[in-house]
């Protein structure tokens, strides 16, 4: 193996630049030529390849976003699009790929490998922490810290005005951000996709948890698949308990921004190195992850098809500290 190419795809996550940096530096350490593919699969199709040396990735470990940009590619979904991408891979003489992203990224990489046998090792880059094969994903810790900073500020105004705040965080299919943010922010409840929402449970908890000395509450809501989910839930509660002053805050894309935390920088650096060394060991069609502090490699098909369960220890911690389960 002489040449590798690195790309980011799908939703951005803090720490992607740290992972790019690590992959590039690891490649040069092992005497490889390293290219970056700008704008993910679209860039692969259009031949948007740039050579990356160590200087090109200096001073990026602390930056959010991705210097290689990211884009969702409809064309790559088609056999014709993937053929164009393969032609560009051959043109530049690329022997192996490093893919940084989530489920969509690895679905594309799986298809591409099955058709053209270009070795690819992935690194999990998504704030949702929803990928099977790694305890944590790049960007998750930073996103939780971003949420926590907002929760702490909202708690101040919620207490001052004795309000109930529903704070919506990202997480379409999983409640990892919601649960960890709720625990670290001392929230009274978290509503997550793993468990069916029951408005009567929320109503009863608020009814029995509100008193003359405790009238403010913070409820964290994972966005799920329904747009404006926190607003919908807030309306349910307001109709049932009109005496409560209910407010909604949607944190949105602020969770994806900002410089990565120390934990994400270290995680991304470990995974960037692991992708390159995985390629050199002859691995292909796998994602590098960290489980129990050790590097592991999981087939893309498993990361795509297997569901990563919510951490039961986190749920147990929340229940014991809060006196109630998050299973609402």
Curated annotation (Swiss-Prot):
Residue sites binding Mg(2+) per the record: 103
Activity modulation comment: Allosterically activated by ADP and other diphosphonucleosides, and allosterically inhibited by phosphoenolpyruvate.
SUPFAM superfamilies noted in UniProt: Phosphofructokinase
Cofactor(s), names only, from the UniProt record: Mg(2+)
Ligand binding (substrate): 126-128, 163, 170-172, 223, 247, 253-256
One MF annotation (Gene Ontology) recorded for this entry: fructose-6-phosphate binding
Keyword Ribosomal protein: no
Positions with a binding annotation for ATP: 11, 72-73, 102-105
An example Gene Ontology biological process: canonical glycolysis
Quaternary state and interactors: Homotetramer.
NCBIfam families xrefs: PFKA_ATP (TIGR02482), PRK03202.1 (NF002872)
Protein name: ATP-dependent 6-phosphofructokinase
